Amino acid sequence: IGFDAGEEETPWYGSVEKEDLDRFLTRTPMGNKGTFGKVLVLAGSGAMCGAAVLCARAVLASGAGMVKVVTEERNRTPLFCALPEAMADFWKEDEPLPEEALLQDLAWADAVVAGPGLSKSRTAKELLVFTVQHTEVPLVLDADALNLIAEDAEILSGCRAEKILTPHVGELARLLHMTIAECQRDPAESAGRAAEKYQACCVRKDSVTVTAEEGREQYYINTSGSSALATAGSGDVLAGITGAFAAKRQCEKNEKKISLAKTAALAAYAHGKAGEAAEEKSSASYVTASEIIRGLQSI
């Protein structure tokens, strides 16, 4: 069903529909690049520029008006060659963070994505801590951001932003200090447990993706996608889509906003439909993350 869940004492299970995507994928003729959402992406160590590129490219392909990437200095040339539409700021490993620039970037953004390819280095952790402490718009935490938080939950102390966690089952197991098998027994329960523990919305990625929200036994079960999504970089793409949708939600008037959980569920649904579209053009075995991004055009 394609509507927000009501207040119920018993667990609620629902899903979103393709028509629900119109609010994020349809543009008003009177808008501009600022009103369609500005997304800040903190991603990419020196060895993982591709994660930053895929995430940022997915942001723009999902309808956001602008994207800025904060990445390691060694990624400067490959980033601009791969994605000339992006703006960027840079940090250097084992050097002080560019805090003034980061504060300006965070104030500029309507949503922030942190983690794809970031690494778990000392400087990457400092960057994540600084971001968490100074972000007031929706914050999507993925990949290495989740791995760092699993090792040190205090990273999130003092966070004022709404949070969306996007773990695959391995990352979820680390976040909950459980085994993968334990996390797979009850997908909704494990997603809900992470949402409660980290006071966030949790998108538990697996063959069936489940989205849970803190404080509510309400679960969105994703109905799109296929094994085509099981490819390197696919999670970076989902993080970008989620950031774009969260930014668009942030730009909406309060009376029109949907829940953060439904926003995240819609991103997972769009990701799945894009994978389906990519699979139709080749086969599940040959789909790449870049093709998933191109598949967004067919939704």
Model-assigned labels for residue ranges:
Residues I1-P138, A143, N147-I164, V169-I299:
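Small-residue (G/A/S/T)-rich helix-start motifs and N-terminal tracts that mark the onset
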